Amino acid sequence: MNWAREVALRIIRERPNEEVYTVASGVSPSGYVHIGNFREIATPYLVAEELKRLGKKVRYILSFDEYDRFRKVPGNIDKSYEKYIGMPYTDLPSPYTENESYATYMENRFLNELKEMGIEVECIYQTKEYQSGRYNKYIKIAMDRRKEIFTIIDSFRTQDATIEEIENYYPISIYCPTCHKDSTKILSYDEKTGNVSYECTCGYSSILNISTATNIKLQWKVDWPMRWMVEQVTFETAGMDHSAANGSKAVSERVVKEIYNYNPPVFTPYNFIGIKGGGAKMSSSKGNVLTLTDLLKVYDKNIILWFYAKYDPMHAFDIALDNDVIRYYGEFDRYVKMYFNNTIDDKNRTIIEQTGVTKDYLNNPNFSYLATFLPIVNYNEDLLKELLEKENINCNTKEYAERLARAKYWVETYGKDYQVKLLEEKNIEVYDSLSPLEKSWLEKTKEILENTYQTSEELQKELYSVVKTKDLSEEELKSTQKRYFQILYNLLLGTSKGPKLGLFLLALDKDKVKELI
């Protein structure tokens, strides 16, 4: 049983009487949503899918925290955006498009990525929710019980609060209607009328009433639990930073129980995701991110979901862009074949089901073949197709075209070790260093290449026989064959290793090979 099934069963045990199980996630449009943020989406999505498989009615919601303040300018956004710090994301203009906000641009980009991943969500836009008045009565509750909330928050602090701090604590921010920033200070609050008197550093001052105000935002540790109650959330996840002993999760759980009279949702924290070969933790605000769009250029959507499905959320892992891409493609392909052949174990069966893979996936060619031979045939797709069809690979499917594009992108962008080409001239230095016996192997190879072979396996078998003699033990034969192949790779590619020789030689012009060896 994998982690998503275990979490789904735990939710049912702890909340057995729910008519609808509301699974929630939230994303800030502070910048491009990266593959680390995607764990915020993938974790509840996989749990929601398991709840459905267990026969439960599920509502999966994605909240865009777009009414949060713009805190700092991401590294990939123009520094002129510093003038917008303190405004809600929906009040900022898009840095790349006209007639839409910063928030809308980032949100739509991410929603398009989710669509490509096949993930459907019910979106909740927090600016709309706050400005519609939907939350006003809950804001009033928080303001009326602000000292109780302060006591809860203060219980998680190590330093004692002063009387002044308690008296001046308000669990809200107010966006100024003039400068649109949250640089406001509350001067007084009347519980009976719900009137709030405030002033802004820009010079504006006013009185608003909570029941009709459209520019109030609850602070995070009150906003989060309030939304749990409003949406009747039964499961949510968040990063390790929120899940610390004195973090926002612990505070919010008490606030939702004691202030809003709602049991907190079942919770699973998640750990960070890195990029293999990269050091720093990804950050939208810093601009150093790998987005789903970037990742989909390398990996099929099913493989991306597989990464998130197979690792427990608490398990930190790296997504590889180096040569391990080949290994992951091979591993996933094997599991899919085992799944459809009904030879897979129960745990991996569940994981493969969670990726949404269909039988059409079996139309995919071997990624390693594509990555290996694309540069060798100088990215000539017609020649590659001719070669692969000899191996009985169907090159006329949608899956083939998509995997070919990913293999080409990966080799050109990340697969430096695979960017090999046939040498233009004979490597005289290597050839002259060979013994007479080793040179005789090359002559036999030339003779073999005079024949016609239907498949690479036929040619591979002939190549293995070149160095085979009766007096060699099995171990000696393996060592000799390895030496023979290294010689061929050095003479053809200038390296000591390379692709499977049978298929490799079928891809090449025979006369050119004979010239080089």
Feature roles, as predicted:
Residues 34, 142, 252, 300, ...:
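Residue-level signal for inorganic ion chemistry
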Residues 68-84, 138-139, 280-282:
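Charged, often glycine-rich, active-site loop that binds/positions anionic groups
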Residues 1-18, 33, 59-60, 150, ...:
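Basic, alpha-helical terminal appendages of large translation-related enzymes
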Residues 119-292:
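Active-site cores that bind ATP or allylic diphosphates and position pyrophosphate for catalysis
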